[in-house]
Amino acid sequence: MPREIITIQAGQCGNSIGSQFWQQLCLEHGISQDGTIEDFATEGGDRKDVFFYQSDDTRYIPRSILIDLEPRVINTIQTGPYRNIYNPENFYVGKSGLGAGNNWGDGYQTGEQVHEEIMEMIEREADGSDSLEGFMMLHSIAGGTGSGLGSFLLERLNDRFPKKIIQTYSVFPDTTSAGDVVVHPYNSLLAMRRLTQNADSVVVLDNGALSHIAADRLHVQEPSFQQTNQLVSTVMSASTTTLRYPGYMHNDLVSILASLIPTPRCHFLMTSYTPFTGDQVEQAKTVRKTTVLDVMRRLLQPKNRMVSTVPGKKSCYISILNVIQGDVDPTDVHKSLLRIRERRLATFIPWGPASIQVALTKRSPYVTMAHRVSGLMLANHTSIATLFKRIVRQYDGMRKRNAFMEAYKKTAPFSENLNEFDEAREVVMDLIADYEAAEDANYLNPELGENASADTDKRMA
């Protein structure tokens, strides 16, 4: 029984990433630009219906809702090479076409005005599923639409579908440089509250780390958004391969998330992918040889993480799931795990199992890969809190001066007071405290904290 997933793309960033993601999925499943199956795509074994449904004329249509408050990116999709695969009823473009002006409040209040139309699209897609497992939202949290309207939709989805999983792929701003959006600390903090309270799992991608990886792997000084979006769509397609080419384990979202998220609040995941090759990304550096050990070792290198964090002395992994694609012998996997353990390449929480979980998955027979093995790591790591701390620090600096506050006060959520900001800050501070507490051996029984012994560092020993 397929467990369907509906994708919701909100804002410029969400739609740009989404459009690349659907192109990648079409290539991997042998679906042509108009949704028909290519003549060569005769091998079975894949589950197309998790992400696509078949129309009356047997074309494959993405289970996707595309939402933006300004028309530019959606116009590009509607005139691009893959324009015919989407359901034309599933586009929502803001009536004024002005966007949300990089203002969370603007995006959120627009959500209140237009939610009936958008929820109707979502409910129509949900009704068309046999056994809906959940939603995947793609957005960025720095601007107005992805963060504000995205926040509103997360709340609504949670109310309307309380039993369904909500996973987001959230692009965080580059907190190490000024960036294009001056008010990103405000927007990010407000969106973070909803990601903490209304999503089951958040895959964090940050523009800073994506640019570093793109610059390093692709030899370009200033990577374009298209290149960084390509990295994101590669990660998204890899993280969904176990759903689309199912094996015995990790073949639905619930089982993937259950293995990664032991406590409900700490559900922010980081990713690494290797090797990025010319198949997914133009002019990528070549990696001469890929063995399972080599791929697994590279996945653990901090420079391959798609999040800029500053690990402290006590930072550690809460959980790791490696999705290994390609021609792999399970005994190689076992040997590689032993080697990683012997060399203590990964430090784990002191209160849980110190194990890297591995999902071996087929790769698409229709896409030629330059490498024998490629891998994606989905990890829950306590150092992600350092990214949240940077956002709070930047928010505090701006809030102290009341910088740019007038624009927010003009919107409905802030018309009477600024409590929304204070509540969001409190939620994010609690989240940071939760991740820091997870580094402690007595996380599960805090009352023992006073008598903790010093030797709780748990590397894979």
Curated annotation (Swiss-Prot):
SUPFAM superfamilies: Tubulin C-terminal domain-like, Tubulin nucleotide-binding domain-like
GO BP annotations listed: cytoplasmic microtubule organization; meiotic spindle organization; microtubule nucleation; mitotic cell cycle; mitotic cytokinesis, division site positioning; mitotic sister chromatid segregation; mitotic spindle midzone assembly; mitotic spindle organization
Binding site for GTP: A142, G143, G144, T145, G146, S147, G148
Transmembrane residue ranges: none
GO cellular component: cytoplasm; equatorial microtubule organizing center; gamma-tubulin ring complex; gamma-tubulin small complex; half bridge of mitotic spindle pole body; inner plaque of mitotic spindle pole body; interphase microtubule organizing center; mating projection tip
Record's keyword annotation contains Cytoplasm: yes
Coiled coil: none
PROSITE patterns on file: TUBULIN (PS00227)
Gene3D superfamilies: Helix hairpin bin, Tubulin/FtsZ, C-terminal domain, Tubulin/FtsZ, GTPase domain
GO molecular function, one term: microtubule nucleator activity
Family that this chain belongs to: Belongs to the tubulin family.
Function per UniProt: Tubulin is the major constituent of microtubules. The gamma chain is found at microtubule organizing centers (MTOC) such as the spindle poles or the centrosome, suggesting that it is involved in the minus-end nucleation of microtubule assembly.
Protein name in UniProt: Tubulin gamma chain
Species annotation: Neurospora crassa (strain ATCC 24698 / 74-OR23-1A / CBS 708.71 / DSM 1257 / FGSC 987)
Organism phylogeny: Eukaryota, Fungi, Dikarya, Ascomycota, Pezizomycotina
